[in-house]
Regions:
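Glycine-rich nucleotide/cofactor/substrate-binding loop typically near the N-terminus or early
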Residues: 71
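Alpha/beta enzyme core
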Residues: 7-9, 13-42, 46, 50-68, ...
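Short, intrinsically disordered, charge-balanced linker/junction segments flanking boundaries
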Residues: 212-218
């Protein structure tokens, strides 16, 4: 980020694609709970378990040749600090280089607890699929002024709590740009415009093989502004 260099991130769930992705210079591989939708065929990420995530993580680790591997912490796997620490430990022992958790300021304690123990954390904000039942679907987040201010303040709080990275999903490009310029940590975007430090896509969407009515999500550039 200090050198204004962009970086790339793709999801992977098994060894062969992980090998191809890594050998072609993708900086970060996310073993995401999106596997619940694109691999298992569910209509959300909620059914994915820790054991399933770890299985796919181990497959990706076996195919990786140098990319940073980030692993999602599935739904309710960090509902308490003790549970979150135990599950993050399992992911790191299985080969992850960092873990990703979803939420706003309420995950600050979890982010700090993990960071204090040497576990790099990516905080996922904006459209957070694990809260899809509360937010009512795949809708752009941060369009109205109060919501925009809330997201900015929570991003700052998460950085202060020790988050090493931030992922912004499906927010307006101007909001993502402001957060990226405000924070010192790298910001990854998906459907959040072109001004974030990095971009991420679900590999099935990139390859055009997703069978979902709503790909995870549209994200070639700035879906939130369209």
């Amino acid at each position: 980020k200090k050198n204004s260099e962009k970086f790339t991130c793709l999801t992977a769930y098994e060894s062969t694609l992980a090998s191809v992705i890594s050998e072609n210079g993708v900086d970060v591989i996310l073993v995401g709970d999106s596997l619940g939708m694109v691999v298992q065929g569910h209509d959300s990420t909620l059914p994915v378990t820790m054991d399933q995530l770890i299985y796919h993580l181990e497959c990706v680790v076996n195919g990786n040749s140098g990319s940073h591997i980030m692993a999602d912490m599935p739904f309710m796997s960090y509902s308490t600090d003790d549970l979150g620490l135990e599950n993050a430990k399992r992911l790191m022992q299985a080969g992850a280089n960092s873990v990703k958790i979803e939420g706003g300021e309420w995950i600050s304690n979890m982010a700090q607890a993990l960071s204090d123990r040497g576990i790099p954390v990516c905080a996922h904000m904006g459209l957070t699929p694990q809260t899809i039942n509360r937010i009512g679907g795949h809708h752009v987040q941060g369009r109205d002024p109060s919501q925009k201010e809330k997201i900015i303040n929570e991003a700052i709080a998460l950085e202060k709590a020790g988050a090493a990275m931030l992922l912004l999903e499906c927010v307006p490009g101007d909001l993502a740009k402001e957060i990226t310029s405000t924070l010192k940590i790298p910001v990854i975007g998906i459907g959040a415009g072109i001004h974030t430090d990095g971009q991420i896509m679900v590999v099935h969407d990139l390859l055009g093989i997703s069978c979902l009515d709503t790909p995870c999500l549209l994200y070639t550039s700035d879906a939130a502004d369209e």
